[in-house]
From Swiss-Prot:
Its EC number is 2.3.1.225. Residues 1-75, 131-196, 297-382 are cytoplasmic. The active site is at C183 (s-palmitoyl cysteine intermediate). This is Palmitoyltransferase ZDHHC16B. The gene is zdhhc16b. Keywords: Acyltransferase, Endoplasmic reticulum, Membrane, Transferase, Transmembrane, Transmembrane helix. Residues 97-107, 218-275 are lumenal. Belongs to the DHHC palmitoyltransferase family. It is found in: Endoplasmic reticulum membrane.
Amino acid sequence: MRSWRWSVSRIMRLFLRWFRLCPRRGHRKRSRVRDLWNYGMVVLKSLYYNVQTNSDTVLDCMFEPIYWLVDNMTRWFGVVFVCLVMALTSSVVVIVYLCVLPIIFSSYPVYWILWHLCYGHWNLLMVVFHYYKATTTQPGFPPQEKTDIPTVTICKKCIVPKPARTHHCSICNRCILKMDHHCPWLNNCVGHFNHRYFFSFCLFMTMGCVYCSISAKDMFLDAYNAIESGRYKGGASQGEAVPGAGLIYISFQHQSSYQTPPPAFTHQERMVHKSLVYLWVLTSSVAVALGALTLWHAILITRGETSVERHINRKERRRLKLRGKLFRNPYHHGRINNWRIFFGVEKGSDWLWRVLLPSTHPPLGDGLTWDCPAYKSSTTAI
C-alpha cells in the first residue's frame, strides 16, 4: 500500500507540470496573434503606405467630402454672387442719382458739383469696366498638346505637365496659368490674363465706396436724425414711452377732441432718409472689408507673389531655414518693377493710359515662361 507521501508528491508533480505547460501554450497563442498582426500590417503598408504621408495628408483625406461639397456649391453659387454684386452696385448708383445728386446740385458750389460729376462718373466707369473684364476674361490655361515649353511638375488631377506658377483649380477643374485664387464674386479664376482686372476692380470699388461714404456722411447724419425724430414724434402721438430726461409716458386719452397731428415727413422724404442711411452703411462696410482685401493683394504684388505662391514660399522658407539656407523668390524683380510687370507698363505714359483709364492690353509674357532675376537661387516656387 502506497504511503500518503507518495500521493502528495504525485499531486505536486501534476501541478508543476500543469504550471509549466500553461505558459508555453499561452506564449504560443500570443506569438501566433503577434505574427498575424505583423503580417496584416505588412500587407496594409505594402498597399497603402507612402513615405510622404503625414498628418496633413490624413486630414485632407478625411475632409475630402467637405472639399468636394464646397467646390461644387461654390461653382453654382458663383452666379448668385455675381448677381448680388450687380444688384448692390446698381442700388448704390440709383440712390446717388435720385437722392445724393439733387442735394449736391442745390447746396454745393459749382466747382464741387463739377468735381463730383467728373470723379464719380470716372470711378463708376472704371468699376464697371474692370468687373466686366474680370468676369469674362479667361485666366489662361496651359496647352494640352505637346510643346517645347519647360515644365516644372505634373498635375496630379489633370495628369499633364504644367509650367511654372501654374496650379490646378478644383472648382474650374482645370490648370490655371499663374493662378492666384478662385473668386466666387467673379465666378471665375484669377490668373495670368485677368489678374490685373481683378485687382483694379477691387481698387476702384474701394475708392468708390470711400468716396460715397465721405461725400454722404453729412447727409447720412441728417437722415438718421430725421428718422429718429420721426420715431420720437410718432411714439409720442400714440402714447408710447419715448426717450428723454427719463421715460415719459404721454397719453392723449383726455384729448379725444383733438385730431392726430400730421406726420413730420412725407412718405417720399422718409424713403430718401432710409435710402441715404442704407447707402452710407453699405459703402462704409464694403470700403473696410474690400479695402483690407485690396491692401493684402497689393502686398503680394509688391513681393512678386500670388496667393498660392505665398503659402508655398512660406513653407520653403521654413524648410531652408532649418538647413541654414536663405530662400529667395525667383519672381521678385523689385517693388517698382513688380508693379510695372503686373500692370503691363513699359513706359512712363502707360501709367495714365493703361492704369488710370480703361485698357484691354494683355499682360507682359505668355504665362508659360518667366524671366527671373540674375540673383535667383536654384530653389524655385512650384
